[in-house]
Amino acid sequence: MDSVPRLNSVLTLVLSGLWHLGLTATNYNCDDPLSNFLSLKAFSSSSDITGSSSSAQLNWRMGTGGWSPADSNAQQWLQIDLQNRVEITAVATQGRYGSSDWVTSYRLMFSDTGHNWQPYNQEDSIWTFVGNMNSDSVVHHKLLHSVRARFVRFVPLEWNPNGKIGMRVEAYGCSYRSDVADFDGRSSLLYRFNQKTMSTLKDVISLKFKSMQGDGVLFHGEGQRGDHITLELQKGRLALYLNLDDSKARLSSTVPLVILGSLLDDQHWHSVLLERVGKQANFTVDMNTQHFRTKGDTDSLDIDYELSFGGIPVPSKPGTFLKKNFHGCIENLYYNGVNIIDLAKRRKHQIYSGNVTFSCSEPQIVPITFINSRSSYLMLPGTPQIDGLSVSFQFRTWNEDGLLLSTELSEGSGTLLLILEGGTLRLLIKKVARHGTEILTGSGLNDGLWHSVSINARRNRVTLTLDNDAASPAPDTSRIQIYSGKSYYFGGCPDNLTDSQCLNPIKAFQGCMRLIFIDNQPKDLISVQQGSLGSFSDLHIDLCSIKDRCLPNYCEHGGHCDQTWTTFYCNCSGTGYTGATCHDSIYEQSCEVYRHRGHTAGFFYVDSDGSGPLGPLQVYCNITEDKIWMTVQHNNTELTRVQGSSPENPYSMTLNYGGSMEQLEALIDGSEYCEQEVIYHCRRSRLLNTPDGAPFTWWIGRSTERHPYWGGAVPGVQQCGCGLEESCLDSRHFCNCDADIDEWANDTGLFSFKDHLPVTQIIIMDTNRTNSEAAWRIGPLRCYGDRHFWNAVSFSTEASYLHFPTFHTEFSADISFFFKTTALSGVFLENLGIKDFFRLEMSSPSEVTFAIDVGNGPIELLVQSPYPLNDNQWHYIRAETNLKETSLQVDNLPQSMREASEGGHFRLQLNSQLFVGGTSSRQKGFLGCIRSLLLNGHKVDLEERAKVTSGVRPGCPGHCSSYGSNCHNGGKCVEKHTGYSCDCTNSPYEGPFCRKEISALFDSGTSVTYMFQEPYPVTKNTSLSSSAIYTDLAPFKETIMLSFMTTQAPTLLLYLNFSSQNFLAILLSRNGSLQVRYRLSKDESHVFNMDTENLANRRVHQVKISRDGPELSIQMDQQLFSYSFSPEVEFRTLRSLVLGKVTETLDLDPEVARANTLGFVGCLSSVQYNHIAPLKAALRHASIAPVTVQKTLTESSCGSMVDSDVNAVTTVHSLSDSFGKTDDHEPLQNAVRSDSAVIGGVIAVVTFITFCVIGIMTRFLYQHKQSHRTNQMKKEYPENLDNSFRNEIDLQNTATECKREYFI
């Protein structure tokens, strides 16, 4: 029995190799001329100048010296009957001898019957061959894929413009032998095994088939335990069912495992190969292969008794079949090395043949193709004035709309129209004076399948029948008297007819028709081609040139393909990609890029390889810190208790990050730094068993390798962090837990070796002893930095360049990068092939060109910029080419785009090195910087290559010149090697771009006083620019900005104290309008009243005061007021700035004192005096800034939302925060998953809420007392203080505090 699998294995390999050899053509000696011994009758043509057939064999010089048609037009052809099916591997052509007649380009077509021709395809399109340039030279073409056919036809496309069509031709190849079986749709072939069950671990099944219909079973086998294999043609596609030993998966209830192919009912030969080894399998239909894994529980396929071909016969019921039988021919059918058809022909006992013959019967069906949606039509005559009408035909198309039939009826019966509209069949009979009749049937008829249509009118009854089979709906009928017309127009109408003769309310039909019957008589379409019947325009007769443009599916990343007759479209919805072929990711490649685009913290999708094969992964971007952290969560970030594990019964947990390992690796490799926090709490549970024992705990990273080191240690040493620091509980061990004590200990640290991250699995084996227990937690993956986005190089000479391996791509190619330069021109990138190439260059200071040739001739796209591109600023370029279009984008300028040519080459075939910053000729080199180069999503490391290349330097300074405007509100751009950062020291804002407001909530007694003196060190390195602020304390210019929100008036917003008791006060007067008061001397005050609405209206308002010498401007929201001081006015030295209530004993102006009495109740934000931000200093640098805060100052989110975004305040909790705070050794029990955790959590929450309520009541009572104090002043001041506003803010703020997150 062991010899059987071995023999099957050998046969599998041998047969697989022979099948592939036959598929690619090519016996080395298969290049003989095939027409040497043919008679003159073997050559035929559409027409001939002699009126009869002429020999057109290569090198023929007699007679007319070759073939030339009577008229030189696109309808001419020359064909050879090779008498038998042969293998054709090459063709050759000449012009007509001794003439100026030759063909410069042509197409090849093949057929087994002389009808239903098939064009020669290459690169998934109809191939055009280059012809001759004179009448004598021979142009030879080796076919990339050999063809097996009896007839070969040459179709001239272009010819010598100074002559006519003229050809002498030859086909090369060899004889072809095959075994063929013909199935009539009611028969099958059975291959019976020598034993009851055939069990195979490997299978190879190969065949070729030609089908007359779209459905039918090609082969089937099944076993009693649920094994089955079935190959079935379903609507012109091959469906494979394959299951190994699964009794639940019956054939009747399963869906196909794989579906391949399309339009396989075209009556042409198609090849099939199924290769299986265990559960791994390859399924190939024609040239398309799909790899898949089979269903089932075992690796063997167990088939009982027999395999059936052509149908699934029902046991004990002869002539009965489970599914529709195959109707067509099968050739060279092999099952694991056994030639099934040969056994049947020799009538071997293993084969049972039922009504199967061994030659392929070919029906003489002549299809036609309507190729033009404007001008294609076919006119066929009918018998006029018959009482009734009968028309039937079959059609197939991809278009939703098109005219199928139009005919003018006799006796004033009107016009009959049959239209395909929105994929539905619509029959209209239009009457001139009366109401017409309409019948609708079918849907989705633009599915590319053959559909039959029949229109019958008899005895005042018209019937429309679609696809006359059991699944069709009942025909729709309507009573009407009609008489047949004399002409029937199919597909469209000629331009020279009136509407009554042929009416087309919709575009012409594009698709195929066949089997046209009028008055129950078939129409000979070959006679139409020869001009003896009817007329036509823009038709291909004797072939159906329908093509499935969605096979293969060129829509990338799971995009859905839809098509019409001429093109395909990609529906990218839900894929995360966009573009003509769903090639371009809609997501950024890192959190760093999101930050650069101006986004704030939050969840984002990151697509690390852009347009590459990896999909997007959801991460959290913490963009509120200097380092932009990217966090990827997994499925188990809580503390987990482990007991009862041992080497014999280990505990294991696998972590799932919501993405593939390839996605995670790309994210990690593209980051500057990554880490994961790991925590291991232990009691009598050893971790690594140091120093010499086998580890009891280990973890697995991105590969399957075990890692016996713990957080804080480095790879290669079996230690924990305390071992490296020599701080372990027991100096004899390198981990705290390895001390194996009966108390809680822990080993906590970080994994940061990127090549090992992320942690994917943890195994624990020492918690099975008495009092032995462990609790572990592995934090999320956290990374920062983008190694690519700021990866830049500088080219210093025109002869310098970087070279990289060839840019390999198939159907889509995209290139993107940033550049900056001061040069007038230069080549960015160039890659060459034998014919194909692409080149991106700045051709002038304001123009970028993208030149490319994919084999159809070079094209050049140009983008012209209205501004110079050599301004030493960063500019962005993106170029893309795909099957649909070629495009070029520069910055945000309008895109330059050109649609791809239909039916041409589309593969970009390159073989030279990729040159960056120059060309292979070392001319027109680029001077400047290039960064962030991406090729189809692949990140090119420019800096690494520049380190070993002369004339090119890694890095490129000067980012702030381009991106300094991203630093808002007075923020200063700071250059970094990898990009830039915004220094918000002198801005009242903060955040990555100085756009986050700093706001505070003021009570009636709150006072913030800023003293003007030497600057405080807000950073480690005090900047000179900061100290320069204070050199002139009586500035000639000053700018004051703030935002406020209040319901109180009068109230004091800001008080600026000068020396000699002078001041500047900004306040709201009694009516809520803005007032600015200057006192510049004892006797001189300046009061500026702004005629505004009541600003104490619980809305945010902005104030900006600018003074340049004596000129003063005050902007209140959108209103601008201008004033002037006298030139003699002198401004004193600054002493202090007060926000809220002025508490110093100062000689206040009475109006200011009145506004100051109750202080300020409300919100202040974004307060700035020149380059000083007093509110920011109070909230962020209170310990080192010259600022004093009295009473309660609460940071709040109630600041202005007018000119800046409100960034979400994000708190990042360390995964170890809830440990060690109460007990340095034992983990908090409520952090471990247990019932006690729930109880403790509830108690803690209730307790905390109680404290919150007490806090709210205390604050309320305090405010009530404060309001009681002010009752004595009610006579002097108006009762317009809105305490409800204060209370609302307090309650909201206290409630917010109660919502803080605690780990309990």
UniProtKB/Swiss-Prot annotation:
Pfam families: EGF, F5_F8_type_C, Laminin_G_2. Residues 546-583, 957-995 form the EGF-like domain. One of its GO terms (biological process) is cell adhesion. Disulfide bonds join C329-C360, C512-C544, C550-C561, C555-C570, C572-C582, C929-C956, C960-C973, C967-C982, C984-C994, C1163-C1198. GO terms for molecular function: aspartic-type endopeptidase activity. Residues 25-174 form the F5/8 type C domain. InterPro entries: Aspartic_peptidase_AS, ConA-like_dom_sf, EGF-like_dom, FA58C, Fibrinogen-like_C, Fibrinogen_a/b/g_C_dom, Galactose-bd-like_sf, Laminin_G. GO terms for cellular component: membrane; synapse. It is found in: Membrane. PROSITE patterns: EGF_3 (PS50026), FA58C_1 (PS01285), FA58C_3 (PS50022), FIBRINOGEN_C_2 (PS51406), LAM_G_DOMAIN (PS50025). Coiled coil: none annotated. Residues 1-24 form the signal peptide. Its main location: membrane. Glycans are attached at N282, N496, N622, N1057. It is a single-pass type I membrane protein. Residues 180-360, 367-544, 791-956, 1020-1198 form the Laminin G-like domain. Residues 584-790 form the Fibrinogen C-terminal domain. The chain crosses the membrane at residues 1237-1257. Belongs to the neurexin family. PANTHER family: CONTACTIN-ASSOCIATED PROTEIN-LIKE 5, PIKACHURIN-LIKE PROTEIN. This is Contactin-associated protein like 5-1. It comes from Mus musculus.
